[in-house]
């Protein structure tokens, strides 16, 4: 109904930002609200809750490096996006704007501040992202996936609520699938993913690790791996040579179901991936993406590693030999895999969308 309150959801155009926004959108629609997504052009390729007529694209730019021309261009682009978002907000009259991180959230959340519309941000990482850090003093409320993210900042901790990471219906369905450890000498299902954009490091390391496994394990292995198009031929050649049952693809649209159907996952440790591993309860070997200013992926992986739900391997230590050793050890210990799955599940939270929706409704004054 056009008369029902509208809530704008703002997110960067990658899965880690979009999927929690989609999960909140599902819950808000269930409660009778209207929702629209404000994002960048990358989001148009994602299927899911948001059809194209529910998406508003505003210009944004990631501020990279210290080149003064790049910084100036990013600033001008974000300013133009803010003006566009302000016009959008005045036209649509939302009761709240909720941001999920990424530079495309800056224009709508800054515009909301100027327009007097309540703003809320959600951050799924163990440390606040750069865009959310900038917005943190400009919004009414902050929601985090993990406890303690802002405990050391008294100016922000008072308006911070820990809610967890909102999960899409597909993840909730996968979370209902119990973990069944591989039987001795039975099939071992291994899933290798590298994040929403794929990861060359997996193509460089994993085939060599599989080669180093005992031949008896080759016959047990059922491998599913995310591989970029440019790496496909060389990766497939290794698995064909070893006669490994392998499904390779640049992207999997049904990743939650695949997480649920595998015995072990090798992955980067983006916030969304870690949250889904915890919600579904699957053991993993996590390789944090290095080089980020805040080392957010290292901290994310630590959430599961600290409870023995995952093995965290820094990229400097991520070699074919090391990975082969870890896979071999886990394959020989089904009970350990079961314990890891239970530990990961214990770190998950399935009611985050409801909790975040409660916060949004409260901040909007409804």
From Swiss-Prot:
The gene is murG. This is UDP-N-acetylglucosamine--N-acetylmuramyl-(pentapeptide) pyrophosphoryl-undecaprenol N-acetylglucosamine transferase. It comes from Bradyrhizobium diazoefficiens (strain JCM 10833 / BCRC 13528 / IAM 13628 / NBRC 14792 / USDA 110). Pathway: Cell wall biogenesis; peptidoglycan biosynthesis. The keyword Acyltransferase does not apply. GO terms for cellular component: plasma membrane. It is found in: Cell inner membrane. One of its GO terms (biological process) is lipid glycosylation. UDP-N-acetyl-alpha-D-glucosamine binds at residues 14-16, 125, 168, 196, 297. The keyword Cell membrane applies. It is an enzyme of class 2 (transferase). Its EC number is 2.4.1.227. One of its GO terms (molecular function) is undecaprenyldiphospho-muramoylpentapeptide beta-N-acetylglucosaminyltransferase activity. It is a peripheral membrane protein. It catalyses: di-trans,octa-cis-undecaprenyl diphospho-N-acetyl-alpha-D-muramoyl-L-alanyl-D-glutamyl-meso-2,6-diaminopimeloyl-D-alanyl-D-alanine + UDP-N-acetyl-alpha-D-glucosamine = di-trans,octa-cis-undecaprenyl diphospho-[N-acetyl-alpha-D-glucosaminyl-(1->4)]-N-acetyl-alpha-D-muramoyl-L-alanyl-D-glutamyl-meso-2,6-diaminopimeloyl-D-alanyl-D-alanine + UDP + H(+). Gene3D superfamilies: Glycogen Phosphorylase B. Cell wall formation. Catalyzes the transfer of a GlcNAc subunit on undecaprenyl-pyrophosphoryl-MurNAc-pentapeptide (lipid intermediate I) to form undecaprenyl-pyrophosphoryl-MurNAc-(pentapeptide)GlcNAc (lipid intermediate II). Belongs to the glycosyltransferase 28 family. MurG subfamily. Keywords: Cell cycle, Cell division, Cell inner membrane, Cell membrane, Cell shape, Cell wall biogenesis/degradation, Glycosyltransferase, Membrane, Peptidoglycan synthesis, Transferase. Its main location: membrane. CDD domains: GT28_MurG.
């Amino acid at each position: 109904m056009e008369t029902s309150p509208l809530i704008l959801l703002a997110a960067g155009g990658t899965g880690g930002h979009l999927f929690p926004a989609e999960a909140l959108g599902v819950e808000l629609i269930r409660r009778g609200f209207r929702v629209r997504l404000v994002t960048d052009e990358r989001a148009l390729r994602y299927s899911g809750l948001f059809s194209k007529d529910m998406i508003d694209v505003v210009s944004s730019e990631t501020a990279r490096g210290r080149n003064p021309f790049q910084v100036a261009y990013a600033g001008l682009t974000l300013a133009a996006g803010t003006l566009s978002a302000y016009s959008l907000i005045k036209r649509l009259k939302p009761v709240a704007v909720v941001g999920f991180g990424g530079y495309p959230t800056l224009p709508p959340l800054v515009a909301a501040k100027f327009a007097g519309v309540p703003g809320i941000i959600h951050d799924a990482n163990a440390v606040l992202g750069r865009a959310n850090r900038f917005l943190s003093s400009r919004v009414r409320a902050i929601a985090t996936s993990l406890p303690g993210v802002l405990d050391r900042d008294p100016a922000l901790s008072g308006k911070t609520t820990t809610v967890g990471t909102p999960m899409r219906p597909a993840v909730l369905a996968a979370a209902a699938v119990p973990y069944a450890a591989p039987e001795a000498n039975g099939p071992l299902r291994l899933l290798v993913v590298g994040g929403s954009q794929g990861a060359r490091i997996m193509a460089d390391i994993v085939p060599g690790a599989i080669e180093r496994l005992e031949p008896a394990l080759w016959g047990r292995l059922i491998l599913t791996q995310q591989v970029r198009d440019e790496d496909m031929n060389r990766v497939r050649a290794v698995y064909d040579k070893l006669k490994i049952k392998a499904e390779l693809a640049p992207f999997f649209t049904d990743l939650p179901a695949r997480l649920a159907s595998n015995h072990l996952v090798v992955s980067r440790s983006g916030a969304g991936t870690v949250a889904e591993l915890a919600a579904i309860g699957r053991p993993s070997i996590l390789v944090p993406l290095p080089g980020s200013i805040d080392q957010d992926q290292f901290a994310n992986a630590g959430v599961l590693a600290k409870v023995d739900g995952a093995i965290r391997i820094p990229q400097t230590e991520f070699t074919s030999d090391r990975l082969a050793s870890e896979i071999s050890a886990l394959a020989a210990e089904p009970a350990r895999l079961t314990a890891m799955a239970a530990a990961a599940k214990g770190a998950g939270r399935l009611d985050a969308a409801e909790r975040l929706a409660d916060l949004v409704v409260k901040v909007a004054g409804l």
